[in-house]
Amino acid sequence: MAEKAENLPSSSAEASEEPSPQTGPNVNQKPSILVLGMAGSGKTTFVQRLTAFLHARKTPPYVINLDPAVSKVPYPVNVDIRDTVKYKEVMKEFGMGPNGAIMTCLNLMCTRFDKVIELINKRSSDFSVCLLDTPGQIEAFTWSASGSIITDSLASSHPTVVMYIVDSARATNPTTFMSNMLYACSILYRTKLPFIVVFNKADIVKPTFALKWMQDFERFDEALEDARSSYMNDLSRSLSLVLDEFYCGLKTVCVSSATGEGFEDVMTAIDESVEAYKKEYVPMYEKVLAEKKLLDEEERKKRDEETLKGKAVHDLNKVANPDEFLESELNSKIDRIHLGGVDEENEEDAELERS
């Protein structure tokens, strides 16, 4: 049965038993895998096959479904967004369409995602990896505030890897292939997390063509010559040259979610990506955190200075005549230090002759 984020204990007594929160990511914790991809690329089937593969190895995963619109999840799920937010009720209540309702559900789930992180941390010793299946409409997750919050929350807590699923059958079209690679590049530079491109449906079309296109520009150029649209050819050719550097450091895996082919390679790529997270992402995260702390300190000092200046101006404007205000302040100080006994002459002074 799926766990609900709301059901996580949060009493002070239970919280006191837990270790104090860490200042940075726990690099020794099991990794989380964010599964992204275009609609129809086979994300859910991929998660199903990977879940079965891990169970067969006696290393079960912790599975989270973040797609509120799916009618049936074909794998055992530990946390299900549908238990927290009702997709159809959101559409009905707010008068939204499918995409708007998905984004609203993610926004609502996002408000409780700290509890999901706590569940992941609590169960970490019981699973090998945490798999997160995202909505079919990729833009609803990757380009929304809630998607960024979920991704950043995971990445700042423990090792996190992004898997981008590509439909190999559709990618045989050079233009579609380039669209997928451009989208993958944008997600990589947006998240800055270790990134794996998974060419799915290898049982239908062997994705070796895609690997050759990524390694050799001339092969991709030859494939473009067979296409009809000259405008798209020129654009794809230009983009291919631009993305050449992107291809160099990109991990790629070819799999078939239908037959189970290539999933050993998936696990190897995950292990390599976790090491990349430790060596590349964590130092970058700590640097950004230190810079933010420094900026916050500078902003605090500026606010304090502005507050003091504002108070001085306010005190000066309390009277219509500043000179009278200063004179009254001076008299007030004199009164505070006046010891008395000099307002009247004493007897000896009175007997002195005055010229």
Curated annotation (Swiss-Prot):
It comes from the Eukaryota. Residues 286-311 form a coiled coil. Residues 1-30 are annotated as: Disordered. Heterodimer with GPN3. Binds to RNA polymerase II (RNAPII). Small GTPase required for proper nuclear import of RNA polymerase II (RNAPII). May act at an RNAP assembly step prior to nuclear import. It is found in: Cytoplasm; Nucleus. InterPro entries: Gpn (IPR004130), Gpn1/Npa3/XAB1 (IPR030230), P-loop_NTPase (IPR027417). Its EC number is 3.6.5.-. It holds the Pfam family ATP_bind_1. GO terms for molecular function: GTP binding; GTPase activity. The record marks N99 as: Stabilizes the phosphate intermediate. One of its GO terms (cellular component) is cytoplasm. GTP binds at G40, S41, G42, K43, T44, T45, N200, K201, A202, D203. Residues 9-21 have a biased composition (Low complexity). This is GPN-loop GTPase 1. A motif (Gly-Pro-Asn (GPN)-loop) lies at residues 97-99. Keywords: Coiled coil, Cytoplasm, GTP-binding, Hydrolase, Nucleotide-binding, Nucleus. Belongs to the GPN-loop GTPase family. The keyword Hydrolase applies.
